[in-house]
């Protein structure tokens, strides 16, 4: 904990400095600066509170140890021992809490997300499972008090999706759903299977933080926009006007097509929304090869052997292969009860980060 204490003392000094700055009338009148300082202060608040409590516990431990050394009263000594035992437990708990709070923060954790779900290996059954995953995430979002909106979809004749893109907005969406990146495998008897045999299919999930113009400004000269006639929903209207939009970010080669909205203006806005997130994702890697690999890891090739989680319907079982977690409540999970899986993934991620920091 010594290295952490060095950081904590500096953090405490900075926190107190921020408190002073935020009460300065000159700073208060500068909205942009005040908001920036407020955000910094908010990011420190929990760890500073835990550290102050920790310092108080250390002081109480020292006091109890002095009582034990100097006491000649058996009752007083017994009481001090009891207090000391309780304080040592508090100290250990606070050390664990502080370690977690001091882990590097993902700057995207508080962002909304754009989620892409694709039916992959398994034909019609894979497209149906893509629809099931969409429903699962939408139910989970509802439980979290988040909002969902389907912004692009390619439905299949059997009622599933070849691809569907959904935007999920709310508090800390990315922090919880970023672990859903990868290939999801389903084992079940398809509705079209007369012999009752279990088939294996795959759907892939990609999760990107939603970025806005503050995060990334794209030069309009770097975007080529093509318009064409939509073949999607919207009745005869779509055949009379070129409302569909295809945007290409020339430096990266990233392409986004959008035709689900009724007007070209709406399709442009939606396409730009997705394009900005993909381009930011690209520049985060600063390397086309890394970008391609990340997209492959996120969206997946759809191969049956590539998976992060398996959903076994006959046995009502879900297994997350990354952490070896198996839960026999598939029916509840598909209804949006994902908390147990996501919480376990967060704990696993934190443990790995702690190990890498050797704290």
Curated annotation (Swiss-Prot):
Coiled-coil features, chain-numbered ranges: none
GO molecular function, one term: translation release factor activity, codon specific
InterPro entries (alphabetical): PCRF, Pep_chain_release_fac_I, Pep_chain_release_fac_I_sf, Prokaryotic/Mito_RF, RF-1
Predominant cellular place of this UniProt entry's protein: cytoplasm
Post-translational modification: Methylated by PrmC. Methylation increases the termination efficiency of RF1.
Subcellular location: Cytoplasm
Family statement: Belongs to the prokaryotic/mitochondrial release factor family.
Function: Peptide chain release factor 1 directs the termination of translation in response to the peptide chain termination codons UAG and UAA.
Protein name: Peptide chain release factor 1
Organism: Lacticaseibacillus paracasei (strain ATCC 334 / BCRC 17002 / CCUG 31169 / CIP 107868 / KCTC 3260 / NRRL B-441)
């Amino acid at each position: 904990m010594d290295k952490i204490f060095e950081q904590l003392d500096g953090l405490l000094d900075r926190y107190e400095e921020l408190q002073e700055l935020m009460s300065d009338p000159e700073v208060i009148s500068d909205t942009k600066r005040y908001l920036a300082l407020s955000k910094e202060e908010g990011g420190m608040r929990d760890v500073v509170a835990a550290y102050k409590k920790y310092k108080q516990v250390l002081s109480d431990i020292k006091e109890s140890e002095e009582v034990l050394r100097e006491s000649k009263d058996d009752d007083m000594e017994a009481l001090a021992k009891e207090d000391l035992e309780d304080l040592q437990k508090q100290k250990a708990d606070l050390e664990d809490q502080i370690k977690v709070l001091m882990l590097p923060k993902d700057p995207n954790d508080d962002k909304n997300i754009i989620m892409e779900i694709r039916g992959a290996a398994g034909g019609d059954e894979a497209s149906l499972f893509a629809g099931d995953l969409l429903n699962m995430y939408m139910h989970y979002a509802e439980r979290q008090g988040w909002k969902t909106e389907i912004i692009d979809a390619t439905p299949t004749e059997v009622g599933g999706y070849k691809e569907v893109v959904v935007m999920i907005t709310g508090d800390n969406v990315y922090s919880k759903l970023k672990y859903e990146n990868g290939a999801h495998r389903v084992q079940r008897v398809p509705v079209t299977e007369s012999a009752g045999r279990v088939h294996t299919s795959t759907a892939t999930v990609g999760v990107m933080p939603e970025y806005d113009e503050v995060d990334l400004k794209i030069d309009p000269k770097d975007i080529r926009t093509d318009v064409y006639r939509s073949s999607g929903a919207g009745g005869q209207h779509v055949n009379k006007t070129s409302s569909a939009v295809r945007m290409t970010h020339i430096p990266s080669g990233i392409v986004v097509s959008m035709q689900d909205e009724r007007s070209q203006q709406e399709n442009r806005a939606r396409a730009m929304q997705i394009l900005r997130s993909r381009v930011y994702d690209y520049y985060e890697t600063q390397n086309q090869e890394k970008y391609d690999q990340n997209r492959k890891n996120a969206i997946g090739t759809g191969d049956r052997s590539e998976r992060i989680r398996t959903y076994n319907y006959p046995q009502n079982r879900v297994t997350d292969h990354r952490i070896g977690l198996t839960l026999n409540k598939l029916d509840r999970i598909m209804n949006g009860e994902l908390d147990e899986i996501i919480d376990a993934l967060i704990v696993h991620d934190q443990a790995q980060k702690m190990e890498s920091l050797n704290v």
